[in-house]
């Protein structure tokens, strides 16, 4: 019997969808992606990469990108006029279809900054797709209307309401996956996210609600010192400079205040007390690779603790928000302003310490005692202790301590211990 014609035996290998995985979640499926990218011909990979920015010039310290022609033609569907999925200082996010949304920017500087960061991440995702599945990937960009396309998800943890459906094991599983996303950005992309928070962690659709958690929004991401080049530039086809990305950062402006690392808050406090040289420490600089990882891991940890509070807060009294609104100072010139953001994490860690019969500490307790000797001035130590007492009162009022047993899960305990390695209330973090 003659063998079948080879063309009839050929299997056409399609690019796995980046918006619909085989289990129904709006994310790349590792089972689908890994075989694809391990077998894809190099020519096909180059064609895929051609849809993104490519390097046109390289110097000792600078890389110049040129933009693909496809980005100058708006071929995407028009968004629904009145539908807005989210908004901020950058602009707004609008739905394009059931599986795609567009992030529109009002300022071209913000647009090109995020576009560069997303471009670097997208190219790294092609090279190592498995490690990147918990990071939201751009699927297109259009210069004329200043928008970047992304897969559409169910919403963010900031707006999430169904905390009764989240178990301690589920929370630990999802945040352990987000650790992979942070490591991917640090190791493979060479950037610090620097804006991890509940508003930038999205929840995917899936057969089991809630779905997978994914890290999003590279709007303020920047290079760390693990890169050979520390400056980036975007030019159009005529050589006109569209954007220069400064890779220097002010460490005091990294992360949202409620999840700012304790070691950063330590420096902010010393600076306010004039115990360190502001001219030295307040200068902008390129964040080191290890410091970048510590900062992102710490902010991810404190974001998880915010989720722990939400899981315990069955009466929805929002104790930490109540504390910030009624007790904590809102004037950044207040010497102890940044200390208030230590209060929720210190109190929650003491609650978890009692639950698990262990000591969980970031170098300061609810009485204002610090591992570093003579850090807080006497009046600030008394003030900090009173703040912790106020928050404990809010927690008791909401009965959060009565729900602690739902956190009895070994994976969550192990993850908390893991996160504690990355931050401490001292000048150099945990040694």
Curated annotation (Swiss-Prot):
Per UniProt, the enzyme's principal EC class comes to: transferase
State any single GO MF term.
protein tyrosine kinase activity
Q: Which residues are named in the active-site annotation? A: 195 (proton acceptor)
Q: Which residues form the Protein kinase domain?
A: 79-368
Membrane-traversing stretches: none
Q: Which PROSITE patterns match?
A: PROTEIN_KINASE_DOM, PROTEIN_KINASE_TYR
What is the protein's name according to its record? Probable ganciclovir kinase
Q: What is its EC number?
A: 2.7.1.-
Keywords assigned by UniProt? ATP-binding, Kinase, Nucleotide-binding, Transferase, Tyrosine-protein kinase
The organism's superkingdom is given as Viruses
UniProt keyword annotation of Kinase present: yes
**Which first-to-last residue range defines the signal peptide?**
none
Q: Which residues bind ATP?
A: 85-93, 103
- Which family is annotated? Belongs to the protein kinase superfamily. Tyr protein kinase family. HCMV ganciclovir subfamily.
Tell me the organism's taxonomic lineage. Answer: Viruses, Duplodnaviria, Heunggongvirae, Peploviricota, Herviviricetes
Briefly state the protein's biological role.
Phosphorylates the antiviral nucleoside analog ganciclovir.
What InterPro entries does the entry give? Answer: Kinase-like_dom_sf, Prot_kinase_dom, Tyr_kinase_AS
The organism encoding this protein is Saimiriine herpesvirus 2 (strain 11)
Q: Which gene encodes it?
A: 36
